[in-house]
Structure formats: structure tokens, C-alpha cells
Amino acid sequence: TEITVDRTRDGLNGFPDFMSKEMAEQPEVLERLVAEAGPQIEELAAAIRASYGAYMLGCGTASYAALTGSYLFSRIASRHVNFAPGSEFKYYEHFLTPQSLVIAFSQSGETADIIEAMLAARNRGSRLAGVVNAPRSTLGRMVDQRVDLLAGPEQCVLSTKAYTAKVAVLLMTAHAVQGTLEVGQQLVLEAAAGLRAMLAPSWTDRVRNVASEIQHAEHLFVIGRGLSYPTALEAALKIKEVSYIHAEGFAAGELKHGVIALVQEGTPCVVYAPNDETHADIISGAMELKARGGHIIGIGPESDPVFDAWLPTPDVGDAAPLVQALPAQMLGYHAALLRGNDPDKPRNLAKSVTVK
């Protein structure tokens, strides 16, 4: 599949920086995937059904997208699709067989650890698949089959639209494995509409106000449960990458196993509270944090008395990770601006990690 890139979109087009531009492009990327990626998604779903052992790999943001996928395959298709960080996979790939399927996620398609892991999988005869934004990249050329992210160039070092594109592909693929691709496509379209509404000035002003509350924080914690747990990890990564605030994501159920010792008076705590089976437990966790002085920033469709601040998201069911990403992206972005950071070029980071 050839991707036609509109070169007029390579510039800033009136945006102050690439991060804000690429965050704003997320709805149209999701709509493009629904319109064009169906055949590749069906092929990947068929390969997953035919495999005996399927494994997903990614590094950084791509790893959290892949981890989200492991939850989606379980919830939607009742299928166990394993996840591993790309940099660790080579240390326990000994169980791979020619019946295995290894799916790598990468924006650039050039990540050194991913390429090394895929070469190891190929040496064991396993089938290779790639979900990639650069079809002519090393990963794009080495795999047996590919799903193109169709996100267009991503210039900011931080990945925003490629992340939501990966999660959208996974949501649709999980439905395709189950034989319900159209249901997955409809969920992605609902999420795209929700994101477009969230990009309105009234909502972004709310995020900017919350960013002003956290800009001087030394530490920040993000919690989620179930499908929102990988989102919490990605949210913490985005915030720390761009704002340089020490942010950590945790499974909410792990709070009492050590994490809560770090919470002090005024510690910002971002709490993902979707309308799903995790809601009651996540609110209980928020209360535990607040009782120890935590400043609770709730993200979800409904407010709650425990929240000190609330960033509303649309209720889109299993597409929740697609709308949950934007609040953290934008929170990190505005905190970075308030702290005088360049959001497009965070210190010590490169767009493509081509060395180990």
C-alpha cells in the first residue's frame, strides 16, 4: 500500500509548534485509518487467528500502545496476545516457533531494539508483522505483512498522533479477529468525534489551568486500572518527556504495595476514571491518595467529589484509550511551555532511537 503524503501538511500551518499541530491532527488520522486500513487490518487479524502464540513488541510509547492491545484482544476477542518491551524480547524469545506471530509497533520503523528482536524472531522461523508509520523503513520492508499507520510525518520528538493511530489499529484488529471489524471502526469514529470536541478552546483552557497547578511540581503520579493502566503509563511518559516533571504511572491496585509512601501534601495525582468495571475501585484509590494529601486530577466522563480538578472525556467504551491520551499530551505540553521548555525538542531525546 502506498501512502500519499500531502506535503502542505509538513509545515506548521499556523500552529506554534509541531506538538500542538500533531495533537490536533489526531481526529483526522483516526478517520483515515477507518477509511483506508481495513484490508491490512483484516490480513493481520487472519494471521493472529492462524498463529499458535502471538507476541507484540514496542519501545517507549509504542510499547504502551502494544500493552493496550493485549487488554483489547482479551476483552474483545477473548484471545491472549502477549506483550513484551522490544528491548527485552531477545532475552526470552527461545519459545518462538514457525507457528508464532511477532507483531512490532514502531513510528519510524528504524528502532534498533525492535529490528534486533525481529531478526531473532525471523531466525526462529516465526511470521513477522509490523504496524508502522514509515512503510519503506527497515521494519516495513522486513515483515511478512504490514499495517500502515497513515499518520503522516511526525516531526515532534514526542509521539502523539502515531500513538493513537497504533491504539486505533489494535482496537479494530481485535474486533476483526472477532469478526466485528465494523463495530471497531464505529468506535474509532466515535473517538475521533470526541477528540475533535475536546480540541475546542473551552476544553483546552481547562487543561491549561490544570497545567498551571502542576508546573512547579517535583513529582507527579498517574494511576489507572484495566484498560486504563497502559494509558497511565503512556500519560506519565508524555508528561515527563516534555515537562521534565518526574512523572510515574502505576496500576491503581498497586498503590498500597509501596507507591503510596511517596504521596505528600500537594502531590499531583492524575486519576483515570472511565465508565467501566474499574470505576468504583479507581475512585477508592483516588480517595486513598487524597487522604494522604494528594491533589487529585480526574480524567473521565463524569466528575466526582474526590477530584480537585477534572478534565472531561467522552464516554466511548472500549475506545477510551483513544480519548484518554489527549489530556495527558496537552497537560504535559502546557506544563512544558509554562516551564520554558521547547515541546518539539526535549533534552536528551531523539525521534528515532537507531542505536542500542
For each predicted feature, which ranges?
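Active-site phosphate/pyrophosphate-binding segments
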Residues: 5, 11-55, 145-268, 309, ...
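Glycine-rich phosphate-binding loops that contact phosphosugars or nucleotide phosphates
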Residues: 46-196, 225, 272-318, 331, ...
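Internal helix-turn-beta structural module
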Residues: 315-343
